[in-house]
């Protein structure tokens, strides 16, 4: 694997909440969250670190958040404001490179391999970008610098908030070897438990494993996991890459076999889907979204999908799809449920995060 790329992953710190606090300094030092109202089954879009001390996090239901933190200051989502600030941040990015891959309004990959500023040092470039953002917008950000995309993303979380972390090419092998598998994107709680049962805790453990076993146990994801654990990630930073859909899927903590249980999962996924639509679809009307889909993966690792064009994306539309696709179960247990919504092509104006 060639490690000659210089990739920076920039992640704004508590982006929406930080903008609100910047615009209203009286909120500083208080637990603040941005999200929907509790009586409307809302969820938190983001919250600041004061709120996180109470165990609050993005995508948590607002009602649960208020139980944990009764003094929480809950602010409505102001997407037009966040988009405007995001564009200001991207203007700063473009001073250093045109190779920018936005992940969401508050997160992006930058390829600065060809950048000559600051003697071509990706570390100094990242520091300069973060300094520009702070001086001009009074917002903090964190950065990860590495020759591979997946490592840059992991690195950006190492010194949050308002910090950065560098993984040099010559450090990749040692860093990856000791990297906990739970740090890798896609290794959720269920996958982590399964890996632990097989004796895999770090990437180094996977390096000593049989490749066929990893592929057999984890399918397509196992191929990516194997590559990452061996310091392989050929993905380029892709500017202006339009995505056509947004989805939510999770492997369940335990397999289920009743429609009632599946309906509860769909209802939970639907709230997460709305949360992600807030971040990625913005303030455009949800009525523009007509095509939805559902996916079931069974305990024999086969899967089936069903898509429909509807008159909206209300919760009951997904529940209807579930009832229709349920007939395909044929006695098998369900290990994964996924929901997705397709974006009209003429509405796609920027990259959207798929299966985020």
From Swiss-Prot:
Pfam families: IMS, IMS_C, IMS_HHH_1
Annotated UmuC domain residues: 7-188
InterPro entries per the UniProt record, alphabetical: DNA/RNA_pol_sf, DNA_pol_Y-fam_lit_finger_sf, DNA_pol_Y-fam_little_finger, DNA_polymerase-Y, DNApol_IV, IMS_HHH_1, Rev_trsase/Diguanyl_cyclase, UmuC
Enzyme class, first EC level, given as a word: transferase
Residues that coordinate or bind Mg(2+): 11, 106
Cofactor note: Binds 2 magnesium ions per subunit.
Signal sequence residues: none
General function of this protein: Poorly processive, error-prone DNA polymerase involved in untargeted mutagenesis. Copies undamaged DNA at stalled replication forks, which arise in vivo from mismatched or misaligned primer ends. These misaligned primers can be extended by PolIV. Exhibits no 3'-5' exonuclease (proofreading) activity. May be involved in translesional synthesis, in conjunction with the beta clamp from PolIII.
Similarity field: Belongs to the DNA polymerase type-Y family.
Assembly notes: Monomer.
PANTHER family the UniProt entry points to: DNA POLYMERASE KAPPA (PTHR11076:SF33), DNA REPAIR POLYMERASE UMUC / TRANSFERASE FAMILY MEMBER (PTHR11076)
Protein's recorded name: DNA polymerase IV
Species, as recorded: Glaesserella parasuis serovar 5 (strain SH0165) (Haemophilus parasuis)
Gene: dinB
């Amino acid at each position: 694997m060639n490690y000659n790329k210089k990739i920076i992953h920039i992640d704004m710190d508590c982006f929406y909440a930080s903008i609100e606090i910047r615009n209203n300094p009286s909120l500083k030092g208080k637990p603040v969250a941005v999200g929907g109202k509790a009586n409307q089954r809302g969820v938190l879009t983001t919250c600041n670190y004061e709120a996180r001390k109470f165990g609050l996090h993005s995508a948590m239901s607002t009602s649960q958040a208020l139980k944990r933190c009764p003094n929480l200051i809950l602010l409505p989502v102001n997407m037009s404001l966040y988009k405007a600030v995001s564009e200001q941040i991207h203007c700063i990015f473009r001073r250093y490179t045109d190779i920018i891959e936005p992940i969401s309004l508050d997160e992006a990959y930058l390829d600065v391999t060809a950048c000559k500023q600051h003697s071509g040092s990706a570390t100094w470039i990242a520091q300069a970008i973060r300094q520009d953002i702070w001086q001009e917008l009074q917002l903090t950000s964190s950065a990860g610098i590495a020759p591979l995309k997946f490592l840059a993303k992991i690195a950006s979380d190492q010194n949050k908030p308002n910090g950065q972390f560098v993984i040099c090419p010559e450090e990749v092998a040692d860093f990856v070897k000791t990297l906990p598998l739970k740090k890798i994107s896609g290794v959720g709680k269920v996958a982590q438990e399964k890996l632990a049962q097989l004796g895999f805790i770090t990437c180094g453990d996977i390096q000593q494993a049989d490749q066929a076993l990893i592929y057999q146990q984890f399918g397509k994801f196992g191929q990516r996991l194997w590559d990452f654990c061996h310091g392989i990630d050929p993905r380029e930073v892709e500017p202006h890459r339009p995505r056509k859909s947004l989805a939510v899927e999770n492997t369940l903590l335990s397999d289920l076999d009743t429609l009632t249980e599946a309906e509860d999962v769909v209802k939970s996924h639907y709230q997460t889907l709305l949360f992600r639509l807030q971040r990625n679809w913005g303030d455009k009307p949800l009525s523009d979204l007509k095509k939805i889909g559902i996916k079931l993966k069974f305990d024999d690792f086969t899967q089936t999908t069903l898509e429909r064009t509807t008159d909206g994306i209300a919760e009951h539309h997904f529940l209807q799809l579930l009832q229709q696709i349920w007939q395909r179960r044929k006695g098998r247990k369900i290990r994964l449920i996924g929901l997705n919504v397709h974006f009209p092509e003429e509405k796609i104006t920027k990259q959207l995060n798929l299966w985020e």
